Amino acid sequence: MMKKIDVKILDPRVGKEFPLPTYATSGSAGLDLRACLDDAVELAPGDTTLVPTGLAIHIADPSLAAMMLPRSGLGHKHGIVLGNLVGLIDSDYQGQLMISVWNRGQDNFTIQPGERIAQMIFVPVVQAEFNLVEDFDATDRGEGGFGHSGRQ
């Protein structure tokens, strides 16, 4: 299923020097987001930075949200992940998409202008209304927390 999402180009290089986000294959879940930088940015181990994408989106449908996720190769090979682990884009947000990048690796890492540094997926959202109760109906698990269901 393809859903139309409004996108605004904030930097004129996007769509020319830096390709618009696209799905790499027909089965891809995520769109690659690129670093819309003037110059390369070097991240030392432990450093974080906010990287602009040059794009703004307006989802406009409260039953959808976008999530920004790390690219698996950058995380596994270089220790480059998102500083907030997952970026959540609400349906009514209209500002620039910014990517919080964290170097959790052991070596310096350089982000090049136009480099693919994150991916964005669209996910369904259910807004819940809380129903206040005194007690819950009993379940097998009950209040068992972390590790309660075992390892095997």
Swiss-Prot record:
Q: Which InterPro entries match?
A: dUTPase (IPR008181), dUTPase-like (IPR029054), dUTPase-like_sf (IPR036157), dUTPase_trimeric (IPR033704)
| EC number(s) per entry | 3.6.1.23
Annotated metabolic or biological route of this protein:
Pyrimidine metabolism; dUMP biosynthesis; dUMP from dCTP (dUTP route): step 2/2
Top EC group: hydrolase
What's the stated role of this polypeptide?
Answer: This enzyme is involved in nucleotide metabolism: it produces dUMP, the immediate precursor of thymidine nucleotides and it decreases the intracellular concentration of dUTP so that uracil cannot be incorporated into DNA.
Please report which protein family the annotation says this sequence is part of. Belongs to the dUTPase family.
Protein name according to UniProt: Deoxyuridine 5'-triphosphate nucleotidohydrolase
This chain's source organism reads Escherichia coli O1:K1 / APEC
